[in-house]
């Protein structure tokens, strides 16, 4: 049955993707320009023969912003590689399909390992993968979108360590690493629920065995080794460097009425589906096991966290402010409530349906979910028909990227606009003290001998060069951000520099024409972390092969 269900999941994936791709357009909204610029930088660096991307030399207005150091991007490589063989729009939709099918597949097998029921796993995968909130994430919010792939596997790993087969600790290590590769904030959110589950374990089991504690610590330790390349840059380049990050504050909470009423609409967005709302309203009458009561409680609590009824004001000044948008908890609400929906509905259906009827039922469920998803995506599709194409603007524009339509012919127009969200993330705090400073970076303005110069950059992978003519020996303040491992050369010779009041590179020049090149050289510790991570993955793979062989005996 696995092949049948995977085939049906692939069918729904392709149908929904082709529905969007047939528009031959993308709606650039929310975080789209931030992530699209990162993918473009990776693609162009790959094209020039550089595998690693550290700073934004070609995008982000050539400011050298280091979002690549502090915001994971490994799962953007498939999108970047697709750019070599497909047009920009088609490359995105091909990547979108890959991510969707990966979500469906991992969801299916995670639920299968938990429930041992194929039909329940199929229903879970359909509802979870094509949930309205996840469809919303797939339009632009790609960090969360990628993290959602691995949440079912992550919570399967937590379950195995705390209640199930503790020898499967590796599931938690692997899934935790994959979530970290996708979205650091999702690690924090997942940790919140992991702590809750740990407390529930202590209460319901009146403690926890030493063996389970060992498995928990082992999974955490291995996970750290796997994610070292993500962690190390924070120690080598962020801590103590006066850099900014995403603003830690709760900027939006939903009202319960908004969540309830919108969840009964068929459109994608900050909502649950009507199926999950019905699960909330009816599941309590059918739940019999303590385990399912725990799952139900977690689903309700996740919904509660999305609303303003939770005292979010009390979290001011705490790490919980990193959440920013409480709608992020909808992914967790969808996960827990979909488990109950899948278990309950599959039990009822399997009592009354067998043989060929079961095959027909599975196909019907796939068609229903496909139609439901197409309905959820219809507003987005209609928007693509009526919104205007993104117009051209100057290469050093300070105008924020508008919510407009991108096609292949105007795809590159977006990169001349100021990135709407995240343009100044991970820059020195001194860069952000005034709009004038920010705009001077976007407009490529340098300061020399009391004058303002507008320069044109010469670009290579992780490298930005400027031609600067000085009438006398003087310091020039370039529109490129200075980091701990920034490198500077003047006329081909390595040169000392300092950080100016814009957080930028300030370097002394001799009289005459000078070529100043600003680059980035990663710490040796970073490359060591990659080696350790790769060796850890290989060691884990060898362990799994031996474990499976022993388990089979």
Label every PLM stretch briefly:
Residues 1-18, 540-553:
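Start-transfer (signal-anchor) and selected internal transmembrane alpha helices
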Residues 8-9, 208-232, 294-301, 367:
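Hydrophobic alpha-helical membrane-interfacial segments at the cytosolic entry of transmembrane helices
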Residues 15-114, 119-152:
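Active-site lumenal/periplasmic loops and adjacent helix-entry segments of GT-C-fold
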Residues 154-168:
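Membrane-interface transmembrane helices that cradle and orient dolichyl/undecaprenyl
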Residues 157, 169-184, 219-225:
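Membrane-interface alpha helices of multi-pass inner-membrane proteins
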Residues 190-220:
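Perimembrane helix-loop-helix junctions
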Residues 225, 272-296, 300-301:
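Hydrophobic, aromatic-rich transmembrane alpha-helices
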Residues 429-553:
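Active-site-proximal, structured, solvent-exposed surfaces of multi-pass membrane proteins
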